[in-house]
């Protein structure tokens, strides 16, 4: 199984392209294609990358935001530092309050974009894997609710399951536009999809009456 996967990887055009163009992973082309289609990241933006290791998405985000922007990558695994000083890596579980507070402190305000190519730990049992995927998706949505500025953007990996449609319905109440897509660089065999939320509409705090 391992040798077959290695052979497929070597013949993968995006794997070869990433090696040639010095990207950390073939996943870099997913966010490049998503950004080209939806104009997610602009120069000067603050971007939070959830599940960032090895850093393929953060690498592209750094290119897009330029010197005036900021990219924060979070992952359980170590993210090898980038030469750019405007990248901050956090090693930890982004589903925990402690790590989320670290992100908030680094931002010092709100983020313009939340990106996530994170996948849950899969065990091969369909029902359990779907529940884990739903939990992870809900966590990413919740973090975006807390840290996105008005009109901010979200893009995240999802796997279709029983609660997929309900999740899209909820997102449509939070963002002016919600799109689903599968970029060309996603493997055809993969069941992954990407959900894009454009123009975040934060809940307005109700003023208490005197």
UniProtKB/Swiss-Prot annotation:
One Pfam family here: FtsJ
Name of this protein: Ribosomal RNA large subunit methyltransferase E
Write out the ranges of the annotated region (Disordered): 175-210
A single GO CC term for this protein reads: cytoplasm
UniProt keyword annotation of Nucleotide-binding present: no
What Gene3D superfamilies is this protein classified in?
A: Vaccinia Virus protein VP39 (3.40.50.150)
Broad class of where this protein is predominantly found:
cytoplasm
Function text: Specifically methylates the uridine in position 2552 of 23S rRNA at the 2'-O position of the ribose in the fully assembled 50S ribosomal subunit.
SUPFAM superfamilies given for it? S-adenosyl-L-methionine-dependent methyltransferases
Q: Which HAMAP family match?
A: RNA_methyltr_E
Q: Which gene encodes it?
A: rlmE
Keyword set for this entry? Cytoplasm, Methyltransferase, rRNA processing, S-adenosyl-L-methionine, Transferase
